[in-house]
From Swiss-Prot:
InterPro entries according to UniProt: ATPase_NBD, Chaperone_DnaK, Heat_shock_70_CS, HSP70_C_sf, HSP70_peptide-bd_sf, Hsp_70_fam
Family per record: Belongs to the heat shock protein 70 family.
Gene behind this protein: dnaK
Role description: Acts as a chaperone.
Protein's recorded name: Chaperone protein DnaK
SUPFAM superfamilies: Actin-like ATPase domain, Heat shock protein 70kD (HSP70), C-terminal subdomain, Heat shock protein 70kD (HSP70), peptide-binding domain
Origin superkingdom: Bacteria
Pfam families listed in its UniProt record: HSP70
Induction section of the entry: By stress conditions e.g. heat shock.
GO terms assigned for molecular function: ATP binding; ATP-dependent protein folding chaperone; unfolded protein binding
Amino acid sequence: MSKIIGIDLGTTNSCVAVMEGGEPKVIPNPEGNRTTPSVVAFKNEERQVGEVAKRQAITNPNTIMSVKRHMGTDYKVEIEGKEYTPQEISAIILQNLKASAEAYLGETVTKAVITVPAYFNDAERQATKDAGRIAGLEVERIINEPTAAALAYGLEKQDEEQKILVYDLGGGTFDVSILELADGTFEVISTAGDNRLGGDDFDQVIIDHLVAEFKKENNIDLSQDKMALQRLKDAAEKAKKDLSGVTQTQISLPFISAGAAGPLHLELTLTRAKFEELSANLVERTLEPTRRALKDAGLSASELDRVILVGGSTRIPAVQEAIKRETGKEPYKGVNPDEVVALGAAVQGGVLTGDVEGVLLLDVTPLSLGIETMGGVFTKLIERNTTIPTSKSQVFSTAADNQPAVDIHVLQGERPMSADNKTLGRFQLTDIPPAPRGIPQIEVTFDIDANGIVNVRAKDLGTSKEQAITIQSSSGLSDEEVDRMVKEAEANADADQKRKEEVELRNEADQLVFQTDKVVKDLEGKVDAAEVAKATEAKEALQAAIEKNELEEIRAKKDALQEIVQQLTVKLYEQAQAAAGQAEGAQGAQDAGAKKDNVVDAEFEEVKEDK
């Protein structure tokens, strides 16, 4: 069976892993890094992903970051006259990770397990699945990030029963999950979180502080300057990371702006204490979902056996201190928090292929599901933190006499009124026979699969007429749209490959020009001038083709020059061999002469024996 890769599609960074030799292993990207920034940039119709896209974000307005925050919404971004959905941008990142995995494994990869924040709703999960399809991946399973992290720790190898709290503070989302582990079964008991809280927000408080300090000193608002703002963002991110290891850091941004007297520089010392003061309310915001998850699980902090930290932002000392204070437990930090989720996704991939045995994952739905009933009331059919997959049915009736149809309005959330919850979709059950209100029996069934994706059926028990939908939110993509995007993504991948080959061809041509100059110089006066002239002429023809950027011409001229240079190189080699042979002959003669010169004539006397 082909390998199933595990992908952590993060807000700020993404990571890909695979099972190898019974262990999950992170796959490095072409630059050799173990995580890839979730950044996509477009430049002259060329797509750039990862570090290269992040580096030029300052000068390129067509750069998209933190697109995960828009998954499951109708957000679109226009780039070079074309509109892109969050699913398409995410698919570009997934394609990049898929290519890294294929280069590493030496085989085509078509299947993946992708992780999502535990608190992602149905629309966000469906959007993630669509992104996978667009990238050419069959998404075998969508699993929650905290659950994946628990899998990565290999805790199923422990004999005793354990209750684990996973605290996951990523770049743009925050989740906390409580899991119960016994006999290789990971059962999620409760989950809570905030999809609008993460490391980006910690960066932002530093940026706001820098902007305020600079304005106080120079009366210039840097937040209005796009270039300055990008430099501030980079500096804030670096300062945040520095303050995890040291108690103060220097922020130095020369020529950040200009005033009447000339250029202005930003110089500021940021202490860990100041950073903790600025971010105190963000840290506090993570504790409320932590308390809610414990309450939903019916546990007190003292009943926890272990606390696991996930996500780069958990390196912040104030965050570690807060969770330690809240749970009374020293957080367990055995695996790199940036990689642990991808490793867990790879383990789940191994479970699905049969490479990993004795592990069973039971996840939960993060939000309650139900329908709108009379008076705009939200009637729950499936309560939050119900183990999935699951199915639940309930019988409803009509609200008016002779009502020919019922509208089924499917919602997800915790509020009592429908208007305050998120609409997942609507559909209609028609052709209900005329009858007084309250008589028709309409059975509504909710199914949630192992990916947390919802299917809803409505059935008239009197006529057995049935209507069903797989929930597709207003921002979701139809199958036709996904198929179109898949074709576009494949075409773009081909175009990207073609562009890569073009760049490599130009590089090879430039290298050959340099090599020709060197060979011609080395052969000066040693071969026929006509041969040197022929090589020089072919070199100039190749340079002209490079100038014109005619690829087929570059290829033809390169091949022609390659042949000439090869012949010249052979001659150069032969001459070097001949010179070496001559030098060896001369050395041999010299050694023989030296031996002759060193002969000493000895005097001797012949003694005749007496017979």
